[in-house]
């Protein structure tokens, strides 16, 4: 059963190189300028234990990692992050901007790894205990464009998922699009192939509209 939250929980999703982190940073600044209490965070990570799990999941040396192991590690990191950071922020009435949440697991492990969206959801349903975003922004991008952005970004360390085949990243995109169809009331799709300013304008409009209506 969905939880009732004092604050407002937004998640931001997309394939590698979709520009989520940039959008969250810009949005955080804009909301703070408007006097809104904001907590920006990321998955996997955000708190000490989850960051330790992140270092395992994304380590380029662990190419032998099994898909189920990967899914379980993400869910474990998510649980700890939720309890330590997201829930306290929501209880304090803050706006939470989270770089990835449960939809990432459904798209990457459930769809692209072939574990099944329903099966991966069961793992995460136990982990999140009813906490779901009020709104999810999905940045849709051509995987080739996204991966090229990563290659050009010298400040970003290449991780294990970046090294997956183009076919894998195309499946991730298919997975996200399937989720957007299933959960159209929660997920807003934004074309991230466009210029940054256009993407940010549409992102801001979607978030402010939801905040105004709560």
Curated annotation (Swiss-Prot):
Family: Belongs to the thymidylate kinase family.
GO biological process, one term: dTTP biosynthetic process
Entry GO MF terms: ATP binding; dTMP kinase activity
CDD domains named in the record: TMPK
Record protein name field: Thymidylate kinase
Keywords for the protein's UniProt record, in alphabetical order: ATP-binding, Kinase, Nucleotide biosynthesis, Nucleotide-binding, Transferase
Provenance organism: Geobacillus kaustophilus (strain HTA426)
Signal peptide: none
């Amino acid at each position: 059963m969905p939880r009732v939250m004092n604050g407002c929980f937004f998640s931001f999703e997309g394939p590698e190189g979709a520009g989520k982190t940039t959008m969250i940073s810009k949005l955080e600044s804009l909301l703070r300028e408007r006097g809104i209490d904001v907590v920006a965070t990321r998955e996997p990570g955000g708190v000490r234990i989850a960051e330790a799990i992140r270092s395992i999941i994304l380590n380029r040396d662990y190419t032998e990692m099994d898909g189920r192991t990967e899914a379980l590690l993400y869910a474990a990191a998510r649980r700890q992050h939720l309890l330590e950071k997201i829930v306290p922020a929501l209880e304090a009435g803050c706006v939470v901007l989270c770089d990835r949440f449960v939809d990432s697991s459904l798209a990457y492990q459930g769809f692209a790894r072939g574990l099944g969206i329903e099966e991966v959801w069961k793992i995460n349903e136990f982990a999140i205990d009813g906490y779901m975003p009020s709104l999810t922004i999905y940045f849709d991008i051509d995987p080739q464009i996204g991966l090229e952005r990563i290659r050009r970004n010298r400040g970003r360390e290449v991780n294990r998922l970046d090294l997956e085949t183009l076919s894998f990243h195309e499946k991730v995109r298919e997975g996200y699009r399937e989720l957007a169809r299933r959960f159209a009331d929660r997920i807003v799709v934004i074309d991230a192939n466009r210029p940054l300013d256009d993407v940010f304008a549409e992102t801001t409009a979607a978030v402010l509209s939801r905040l105004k209506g709560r």
